[in-house]
Amino acid sequence: MELVLKDAQSALTVSETTFGRDFNEALVHQVVVAYAAGARQGTRAQKTRAEVTGSGKKPWRQKGTGRARAGSVKSPIWRSGGVTFAAKPQDHSQKVNKKMYRGALKSILSELVRQDRLIVVEQFSLEAPKTKLLVEKLKEMALEDVLIITGELDENLFLAARNLYKVDVRDAAAIDPVSLIAFDKVVMTADAVKQVEEMLA
């Protein structure tokens, strides 16, 4: 199959298995959920009654004081006592096979092509790292909410896009399923397309 280059009167021949496969919604959902789960910190931590600092001595005798019976100053019902079901650090990551991950990326790329959300250009670069230059270039292409993928990371482009809320710049090796579906449009350079094809082959 062929992808038309927007900035040139030519087309790029690409693999049908990468850019023309059926959309597997269940697979994409599973991989996106796993990717998001892997990004969770899971570092919250509280102390149980065993971990709270304090004496193990009974605060006062069982009977005769008129006060409620108490066996420990670390009791969860006491102020500064331990937490009953204390939260502990957790690893939320889910196992995803390479074949599944690559399959999901291929599925997403194919769907982007079908929905006319993937724009392929010969090259995409800036003379200087100026946000103004990038905004003008995107305005010319009628783009606003966009992910730009280049073969090698273009520093000028990266620096110019840092200040734009709905624009992100990646190199081909750094693509992920969440970013591909998060933006309205995805702009890829011809060399980025070839790199992604090799990566997912």
Curated annotation (Swiss-Prot):
This protein's GO CC annotations: ribonucleoprotein complex; ribosome
Gene Ontology molecular-function annotations: rRNA binding; structural constituent of ribosome
GO biological process assignments: translation
Keywords carried by this UniProt record: Ribonucleoprotein, Ribosomal protein, RNA-binding, rRNA-binding
Family indicated by similarity: Belongs to the universal ribosomal protein uL4 family.
HAMAP family, per the entry: Ribosomal_uL4_B
Full protein name: Large ribosomal subunit protein uL4
Organism listed in the record: Pectobacterium atrosepticum (strain SCRI 1043 / ATCC BAA-672) (Erwinia carotovora subsp. atroseptica)
